[in-house]
Amino acid sequence: MSENLNLLQYLRKIQVEWELDAEQLSKISHVGVATLQKYFSMKPEEMESLPTVPSGLDTAMPLVSTYKNLVRMFPDTEKLNEWLVVPNELFEGNKPIEVMAMSPNHLSWVSYTLESQAREKP
């Protein structure tokens, strides 16, 4: 996993690896499609001048944390992608990706749950 990615690079990586269209990424990051498109269309040199968490992207931070934990738990991308769409008892029988899309608080819940599981593993 790349360690020196910025928030926008992580969001793009999530979109590609999880095979999400712009609307799906918008739903699980809780960032408007127009905002995502604005930042994704920036040139690399323009991105360098942005703050660590660019305006309007604060709700996407738990998604990056979720992604990082899932990559640690499931090095196999196919298993990771399967985990996202299979009903899970940790989330009251809901699919994790659907829980993430419910609200920023639900996204944080998924992120927190995965972080807790990661800490429990040796």
What residue ranges belong to the model's regions?
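Non-transmembrane "mature" sequence context
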Residues: M1-P122
